[in-house]
Amino acid sequence: AKRVCKDGGKIFFSFISNDFVFLTEFGYDVNYFSNGDYDKETFKLNDFPFVFHTVGAARKLLADGGINILHEVASDGASELLAARINEMSDEDYTQYLRYHFYICEKPELLGMTNHLLFMGEKK
């Protein structure tokens, strides 16, 4: 995408967040912290079949690639963990939940608490 984007053009990038996957996997396997497929010292997930990035690593990858980051978004937050509960919500509660999600999804202190990160960048 960067090769065909003009200087100053906008590009969206999506990453799988390394750090929140642990809680998602723990939801499926109570023993994930002892038998999960990750480095037990660094907490780096093994990049198969997906590639995982921390927020910092994603930022560095974009900066090193000549991308100026304009927005950073925790795309789904805890929604995957709470999917069953969210599906049970009334329309009124769901509307308020979405308002809450949009309220917190760009807070820097919560960017790592999501399975998916979305970056909006600009080609330098």
List PLM regions with ranges.
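Conserved class I S-adenosyl-L-methionine
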Residues: K10-Y38
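Short glycine/proline-rich turn/loop motifs
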Residues: Y38-F43, F102
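Acceptor-substrate binding/catalytic loop of class I
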Residues: E41-A57
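Conserved S-adenosyl-L-methionine
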Residues: V55, R59, I67-A78
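A C-terminal cap/extension of S-adenosyl-L-methionine-dependent methyltransferases
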Residues: H71-K124
